[in-house]
Amino acid sequence: MAFTGNFMCTSFKVELMQAQHNFTNSTGHTFKIALYDNNASFTAATTDYTATNEVSASGSYSAGGGTLTNVTPTSSSTTAFTDFDDITFTSATITARGALIYNTTTGGGSGTTDTVVVLDFGSDKTSTSGDFQIVFPTADASNAIIRIA
């Protein structure tokens, strides 16, 4: 088992302080989600997207993953948060253990594919010639996929 948990990448935290990421819906950067098999090994130290151990293209899933639709950041009390619309890869045969969300627009790390978060699905998730859907948690201060308290 290579995935060991969900992480907000340390490089992402630094890049936030450098104004490298823009999550605004209409004028923000392009964020993607790439799916990986259980051989992938990601931690909070992951800095860039990689094709190594990414699942094979199938149906509407292609190399590099799918483009996410940003939800403009907001706050509640002392927590700022943002989210993405759910994404579905149709007619896909996929077995994925986890994912990377990364920014295709920045140049803050070692390239233009700076990672934001590592997602561990907890076990392999599969679809066979069907829909592979990623449902993001509720966009609030306690549950949003990206939160800063």
Label each PLM-derived region with a short phrase:
Residues 1-97, 104-149:
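Small cysteine-rich, disulfide-bonded extracellular modules of the LU/uPAR three-finger superfamily
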